[in-house]
Amino acid sequence: MDTTEKLKLINRNLKEVIGGDIMEKIINKRDLNVYWGTATTGKPHIAYFLPILKIKDFVDAGCNVTILLADIHAFLDNLKAPIEKIECRSQYYKKIITLMLKSIKVDVSKISFIFGSEYQKSNKYFTDILRILNQTKKNDARRAGSEVVKQVKNSKLSSLVYPAMQALDEEYLNVDVQFGGIDQRKIFMYAREFLPLLKYKKRIHLMNPMIPGLNSDKMSSSDIDSKIDLLDTKLEIYKKIHNCSLENEGLIFLFKSIIYPYCSIFNLQIMISGKVYTFDKLYEDIKMKIIDETELKNIASDMIERLICPIRDEMLRDLKLIENAYGNK
C-alpha cells in the first residue's frame, strides 16, 4: 500500500483532519503512531463501534495503534467512575474493546493497550501537569473540556485538570496522532496551543462524527433509551430499534456508520422487499417515505444482533467482572 492509499484509508469517513500535511510527510518515512483514548466510565455501547471501525482502518493502513484506557480521567470527570470501581471498569473496557476489535477482523496483536495510571502517577508527568497548568487560565480549561467533561454549575477542580492531562498524553504516549470524536475538538485545540509552551510538538488530530441517539441528539451511556448496550438481549435490541423514530436520523446514522461498514467487511448485503440497497438509495427512500419501515427496522435489529451477539455471549461468561464493574444494573 503506497502513501496515497494509506492516507485515503486513514482519512476515510472522518469529520475533520488537523495537520494532514504533516501526516503525509511522516507516512513517506515510516508508519504513523496513533492513539485513541477512552475514559473508563459507563458501559461501552453500539456507538463505540464508530471509533473501533476507524481503528481497523488505521491498522490496515499500517499504523501503530495505542488504546489508552483513561482510568484516572474517569475519576476526574465529576466522579463518573468511583475510585473503588476504576480498576474493574478498566478491565471491563479492555476485554470488551478487544472483543469488538476481533469481531470486525482486527489483528489485536497490532494494538497496544495502556492504562493512564501506568504513567500518569510518575514524578515527571506530575511536574509537567504543574507546568501546563501554570500556563492555563481557568476559562481555558473550562472551554477545552466543555464538550467532553460533565458540565455542572460549580465545577470541581479535578474536571479542569482533565484537558491538561489529555494534552500531555500525546507526549507521554510518544504518538504522532490523537484520534477522537468531533466532541474532542476543543481539547485537541488546547493541546495544539499549550504543548508547544512546554517545548513539546503539536500533534495531528483526526476526528470522527458523533452518532446521534436513537431518540436524542447524542448516544450516551447515561441515557438508556438513546443507546444499544453491547450486553442488550436480542429482544431489547428489537424493542429499542422499533421504538425509535426515523425523523431524528439516529437509525439512519447507525446504517451509515456501523451497519454498512460491517456488511462491507463480511461481504453482506442489505436487502429490503427483495431489493438490494446501497446506503445512498436507502437514505433516499427513507426520506421519500417509500420504504417499509417495519422491514427496515427488522433488518437493523438483525444486523446489530449479529454484530454484538458474540461479544455479549463472551462477556456474559464473566458475570463477576460485570458485577464488580457496574453492579447488577
UniProtKB/Swiss-Prot annotation:
GO terms for cellular component: cytoplasm. It catalyses: tRNA(Tyr) + L-tyrosine + ATP = L-tyrosyl-tRNA(Tyr) + AMP + diphosphate + H(+). Its main location: cytoplasm. It is found in: Cytoplasm. L-tyrosine binds at Y35, Y162, Q166, D169, Q184. One of its GO terms (biological process) is tyrosyl-tRNA aminoacylation. It comes from the Eukaryota. One of its GO terms (molecular function) is tyrosine-tRNA ligase activity. The keyword Hydrolase does not apply. Keywords: Aminoacyl-tRNA synthetase, ATP-binding, Cytoplasm, Ligase, Nucleotide-binding, Protein biosynthesis. It holds the Pfam family tRNA-synt_1b. Its EC number is 6.1.1.1. A motif ('HIGH' region) lies at residues 40-48. Gene3D superfamilies: HUPs, Tyrosyl-Transfer RNA Synthetase. PANTHER family: TYROSINE--TRNA LIGASE, CYTOPLASMIC, TYROSINE-TRNA LIGASE. Belongs to the class-I aminoacyl-tRNA synthetase family. Homodimer. This is Probable tyrosine--tRNA ligase, cytoplasmic. The lineage of its organism: Eukaryota, Fungi, Fungi incertae sedis, Microsporidia, Nosematidae.
